[in-house]
Amino acid sequence: MREQNYGRIVFTSSSSGLYGNFGQSNYGAAKMAMLGLMNTLHLEGAKNNIRVNCLAPTAGTAMTEGLLPEPVFKLLSPEAVSPAVVFLAGLDAPSRKVLGAGGGSFAVFKGFETVGVNLLPDNVSPEGIAAAWDNINDPAGMQEFTGGFEQTGKFAKQGAEKLGLDLS
């Protein structure tokens, strides 16, 4: 793919990885790992026009047969998911997206991080976290990062501001 300066990779994730599903801890962990692999390969392949995505299908399959009522099983046909794979593997595919697909519905899953709170210098403790929990968990101003170092930079900036440090 690097040599031809073009490539498309589509991993299969799952709502069991994105949101959890009772009794599927091993399956959910493996499917969530696809997001980490996608994120890293996206960063490594972007300069070579390699686009990497995940599909999170919801379909009536051998794994879900007997778990879903028959009308739902029929509605969630694998054929209703197939166009998503073709799109994600196409010439104009996006990159670093998790596309959910099922029953003719399509949606993008996004992972966001709250602004958070810095507890330096005196409140870095379980009790400090508990006392600040409402602010730590506040969804206002959530951010979507494009790389792990963006979170590192955010945390360093918050700590420096709290302590009055200049990081430049």
Where are these regions (language model features)?
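Active-site "substrate specificity/gating" loop of NAD(P)-dependent dehydrogenases
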Residues: 20-24, 64
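C-terminal helical subdomain
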Residues: 72-165
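Hydrophobic structural elements of the Rossmann-like NAD(P)H-binding subdomain
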Residues: 10, 52-55, 96, 101
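Residue(s) in the substrate-gating loop at a strand-loop-helix junction
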Residues: 14
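Active-site-adjacent segment of SDR/Rossmann-fold oxidoreductases
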Residues: 1, 19, 35, 40-50, ...
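Catalytic tyrosine of NAD(P)H-dependent dehydrogenase/reductases that use a Tyr as the general acid/base
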Residues: 27
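A glycine/serine/threonine-rich, flexible loop-to-helix segment
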Residues: 43, 47, 54-75, 109-119
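Active-site helix of classical SDR
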Residues: 30
